From Swiss-Prot:
Belongs to the UPF0047 family. PANTHER family: UNCHARACTERIZED PROTEIN YJBQ-RELATED, UPF0047 PROTEIN C4A8.02C. This is UPF0047 protein AF_2050.
């Protein structure tokens, strides 16, 4: 299955947990969630608004935009590639009786670092 996301900002976090869970109804096993873009990432963490803002602020401090990275000579988005590299492009979650076996506060979060764009997320039940 594939999800299509339309991001609205250059940098944002979108909770895709419910969409992924709909993809695995009546399944058991594992689900692989993968983003095929080099300027996006996937993580599992709490979806509380303050934490999401903290994550974005932390990533910006860690890898600031427009700091003269070599790749910026081509596309002005080197920071987005570096941020995505640090976080990774996939997560794997156990599925039990059609439900994601996530912890109480855990959510699957899609991170956009070079939007706004239309993005794909591949969801593969294993």
């Amino acid at each position: 299955m594939e999800l299509t996301l339309k991001t609205a900002k250059r940098v944002e976090i979108i909770d895709i947990t419910d969409q992924v869970e709909r993809c695995v109804e009546s399944r058991d096993g594992l689900v692989l969630v993968y983003t095929p873009h080099t300027t996006t990432a996937l993580v599992i963490n709490e979806g509380e608004r303050g934490l999401l803002e903290d994550i974005l602020e932390f990533m910006e401090k860690l890898v600031p935009y427009g700091k003269g990275y070599k790749h910026d000579r081509l596309d002005s988005n080197a920071d987005a590639h570096l941020k995505a590299t640090l976080l990774g492009n996939s997560v794997v979650v156990p599925v039990e009786s059609g439900k994601l076996a996530l912890g109480t506060w855990q959510r699957i979060l899609f991170l956009e670092f070079d939007g706004p764009r239309t993005r794909r997320v591949i969801v593969k039940a294993l």
